[in-house]
Swiss-Prot record:
GO terms for biological process: proteolysis. The active site is at E144. It is a multi-pass membrane protein. Gene3D superfamilies: Metalloproteases ('zincins'), catalytic domain (3.30.2010.10). It is found in: Cell inner membrane. The keyword Repeat does not apply. Keywords: Cell inner membrane, Cell membrane, Hydrolase, Membrane, Metal-binding, Metalloprotease, Protease, Transmembrane, Transmembrane helix, Zinc. This is Protease HtpX. Zn(2+) binds at H143, H147, E221. Its cofactor is Zn(2+). Its EC number is 3.4.24.-. HAMAP family: Pept_M48_protease_HtpX. It is an enzyme of class 3 (hydrolase).
Length: 287
């Protein structure tokens, strides 16, 4: 969960910064934002650019945000077990050994991130290591390794890029119409109105688009649960999810939230990056 929220937050920040830059370019160069083909190309460049910048930064930002400590050389039996388990599961699914890190948190959680299947990160909380049995922790690790093997981070990036493109395009298209009507008597667009309307619409459309990205995130969680069940057995995966039902609510942020094993509760399931635990457990029982 922490993974997704960090990705989304970083992506939003990058897109907003690029949006400001784009508006400045319009103002300085005198380019007309009304050209649909040019606007669409520009929206795609900035939309996908924001997503891929977020993806490339995800590993370092995730470690920094949680204060994760990378295991270079295992110092105790728990770290040995953690490295051996991730290594074995990675070999089973055919990916390179991820960087493994531990971060200090009472939450029972873990997340994976990274731009490449063979250059990724798996991080687990001290709360998970202290409160889960080895079988349960093994299932959680299998869930995260499955996210990496399935290329979920890249797929999420592509989806976010498409969403960003349409958000930028629609907001500027509508803003151009509003600005033109507002200043029709002067025969030109009111750039201040254009800037203001486009920025507000980006925030509104970005929020609405989050329903799409959260739907995909929930869909991906079911697949990661099923793949983890195939790796370690569905009873271990069910036991891990049952443990999460009585755990603390996680405090992961942004993009990391989406790729964690456990997600925050929301007022509506439509805004949740993870399906309700009961639904995930029921899905596993029906396998």
């Amino acid at each position: 969960m922490k993974r997704v929220m960090l990705f989304l937050a970083t992506n939003l920040a990058v897109v907003l910064v690029l949006s400001v830059v784009l508006n400045i370019v319009y103002a300085v160069t005198g380019m007309q934002p009304g050209s649909l083909s040019g606007l669409l190309v520009m929206a795609a460049v900035f939309g996908f650019g924001g997503s891929f910048i977020s993806l490339m930064m995800s590993k370092k930002m995730a470690l920094r945000s949680v204060g994760g400590m990378v295991i270079e050389s295992p110092r105790n039996e728990t770290e040995h077990w953690l490295m051996e388990t991730v290594s074995r599961q990675s070999q089973q699914v055919g990916i390179g050994m991820p960087t493994v890190a531990i971060y200090d948190s009472p939450d029972i959680n873990a997340f994976a991130t990274g731009a490449k299947r063979n250059d990724s990160l798996v991080a687990v909380s001290t709360g998970l290591l202290h409160n889960m049995t080895r079988d349960e922790a093994e299932a959680v690790l299998a869930h995260e390794v499955s996210h990496i093997a399935n290329g979920d981070m890249v797929t999420m990036t592509l989806m976010q890029g498409v969403v960003n493109t349409f958000v930028i395009f629609l907001s500027r298209f509508i803003a151009n119409i509003v600005a033109s009507n507002d200043n029709e008597e002067e025969g030109g667009s009111n750039m201040m109105v254009y800037f203001g309307v486009s920025m507000v619409l980006e925030l509104v459309f970005g929020f609405l688009a989050s329903f799409i990205t959260m739907w995909y995130s929930r869909h991906r969680e079911f697949h990661a649960d099923a793949d983890a069940a195939h790796l370690v057995g569905k009873e271990k995966m069910i036991a891990a999810l049952e443990r999460l039902k009585v755990s603390h609510e996680p405090q992961l942020e942004g993009s990391m939230m989406a790729f964690g094993i456990n997600g925050k509760k929301s007022l509506t399931e439509l805004l949740m990056s993870h399906p309700p635990l009961d639904k995930r457990i029921a899905s596993l029982r029906n396998m």
